[in-house]
Curated annotation (Swiss-Prot):
Naturally occurring in which organism (per UniProt): Arabidopsis thaliana
RNA-binding among keywords: no
Complex formation: Part of a SCF (ASK-cullin-F-box) protein ligase complex. Interacts with SKP1A/ASK1, SKP1B/ASK2, ASK4, ASK11 and ASK13.
SUPFAM superfamilies referenced in this protein's UniProt entry, alphabetically: F-box domain (SSF81383), LysM domain (SSF54106)
UniProt cross-references to Pfam families, sorted A to Z: F-box-like (PF12937), LysM (PF01476)
Domain notes: The F-box is necessary for the interaction with ASK proteins.
Top-level taxon in the UniProt lineage: Eukaryota
GO BP, sorted A to Z: protein ubiquitination
Domain LysM: 74-118
UniProt cross-references to SMART domains, sorted A to Z: LysM (SM00257)
Protein name per the record: F-box protein At1g55000
Length: 221
């Protein structure tokens, strides 16, 4: 009956991987109650990467099914002059991997965000760190996020969400659609430039053109 003793099961399950814990939870109710305990699951999830602490809990339990390196990411706060290419070089990752992780269709999608998630290229960077389980609103996925600067800052509003305008909802939609076609970018990027131009489409196009010129001069395209 030792395999039904809770204390014995905890000692055994502490040595299991995430996948093995999932299998153990299917054996019987007793095993399930132990194998799904938060402490055991978190320990198994973080153990391969030697993470010191995992803060937060995912909205979906399916998050725990896989603890591959792709479940972790670095949070990079966007600064003026950043581009997907320059960040790929900085963090030694592929451009397509950044775009895929962040659910970006074009490089200009960077301008509609206050941060990007950067894939982990060197697992050693996770050792003895604190990661935060977050649902990224742009990437539309839950990830364990590492903040190289120490801790997450209070979330900033999405550019353009607090802009006041006399346009109707339909008028705004048409304006954004027109800018999107002119700039050949996604809606988020068009909305960003419209926001920093305080609703003036001509100024938005000028700002966008200025950024493109800067990128070309800096050799980032």
């Amino acid at each position: 009956m030792a395999l039904y003793c809770r204390d014995t099961l905890i000692i055994i399950f502490q040595k299991l991987t995430v996948a093995d814990l999932a299998r153990a939870s299917c054996v019987c109710k007793v095993w399930n109650s132990v194998a799904t305990e938060d402490d055991l699951v978190v320990s198994a999830f973080t153990a391969p990467w030697r993470i010191k602490e995992l803060v937060g809990r995912p909205a979906s339990v399916s998050f725990w099914r896989d603890n591959g390196i792709w479940k972790f990411a670095i949070s990079h706060r966007i600064c003026r002059g950043d581009s997907v290419t320059s960040l790929a070089v900085k963090y030694a990752v592929q451009v397509m991997d950044i775009k895929r992780l962040n659910n970006m269709m074009s490089d200009h999608g960077i301008y509609s965000r206050d941060r990007l998630l950067i894939p982990i290229s060197n697992p050693e960077i996770l050792a003895n760190t604190t990661c935060y389980v977050e649902l990224d609103k742009y990437a539309k996925r839950e990830v364990a996020v590492l903040y190289l600067e120490g801790a997450p800052k209070r979330e900033q509003p999405v550019p353009g969400t607090n802009q006041q305008s006399n346009l109707s909802a339909d008028g705004k939609r048409r304006l954004i659609e027109s800018l999107r076609r002119s700039m050949q970018v996604d809606d988020g990027t068009a909305l960003y430039y419209l926001a920093i131009a305080e609703g003036d489409p001509r100024s938005a196009l000028s700002e966008f053109s200025a950024d493109l010129r800067w990128e070309r001069q800096a050799g980032l395209n």
